[in-house]
Amino acid sequence: MPVVRSKICGITRVEDALIAAKAGADAIGLVFYGKSPRAVSLQRAREIVAALPPFVTTVGLFVNASRCEINEILDAVPLDMLQFHGDESPAQCEGFHRPWYKALRVGGGEDIAAQVALYANASGVLLDTFVAGVPGGTGECFDWSLIPPNLSKPLILAGGLTADNVEQAIAQVRPYAVDISGGVEASKGIKDAVKVETFVRRVRSVM
C-alpha cells in the first residue's frame, strides 16, 4: 500500500507548526475563516510559513471567501495549496495559480462520485462529516462505507479522526491522505505535541 500522507490542520502557532513538521507531517493547514476558533491573522500566517522547514506543504483553508479576499491573502502569505471548504462552485475555486482541492461534506444522501466529478480541475477531494451549519472541524466521523471505490481524484479523509481510529480508517478507506485538526488538540487551536506525534506515527505505520 502506498504511504499515506498526513495534514495537521488548524495551526495557529509557530510552535505547533514546528511540532507537526518534526513529527513528520506532510502538510499543515492555516484557516482563513473568521468564524473559526482556529482562524489566523495574515501576520501570524506569515510567521508560521516562514518558520517551516523545506518540504512541508502549506495549505490555506477558505470558506466561501471572495476572490478579492483570497488574492489579498495570497499576496501576503506564500501558500502552496488552497482548500475550499464551503459551497464554492468549480469556477470559484479556479484562477488563483495554485493547486487546490475541494472539501465535500458527507451526510448519507449524496452522490459522492458525481460531486467529485464536478471538480474536474481539482488536485484532490477532501471528504468531511456533514453537520448542518458547520463547514468543518466537527470532530465527528461519518460512515466510511459511503465512500465509493475508485474515485476519480486523490482522496483526503477528514472528520473525527484521532490516533485511535486512523489505522482503521486507512485500512478501510485507503485514502491518499488523512487530515486532522481537533483530534490532536489540547484546546481549540492549540495542538498537543504527544497527540500530533502519535497520530503521524500511526499513519506511517500502516502498511
From Swiss-Prot:
Annotated metabolic or biological route of this protein: Amino-acid biosynthesis; L-tryptophan biosynthesis; L-tryptophan from chorismate: step 3/5
Residues that span the membrane, as ranges: none
UniProt-listed InterPro entries: Aldolase_TIM, PRAI_dom, RibuloseP-bd_barrel, TrpF_fam
SUPFAM superfamilies: Ribulose-phoshate binding barrel
GO molecular function, one term: phosphoribosylanthranilate isomerase activity
Short name of one Pfam family: PRAI
Record keywords: Amino-acid biosynthesis, Aromatic amino acid biosynthesis, Isomerase, Tryptophan biosynthesis
Reaction catalysed by this enzyme: N-(5-phospho-beta-D-ribosyl)anthranilate = 1-(2-carboxyphenylamino)-1-deoxy-D-ribulose 5-phosphate
EC number: 5.3.1.24
One of the protein's GO biological processes: L-tryptophan biosynthetic process
Domain of life: Bacteria
Family: Belongs to the TrpF family.
Annotated protein name in UniProt: N-(5'-phosphoribosyl)anthranilate isomerase
Source organism (scientific name): Stutzerimonas stutzeri (strain A1501)
Lineage of producing organism: Bacteria, Pseudomonadati, Pseudomonadota, Gammaproteobacteria, Pseudomonadales
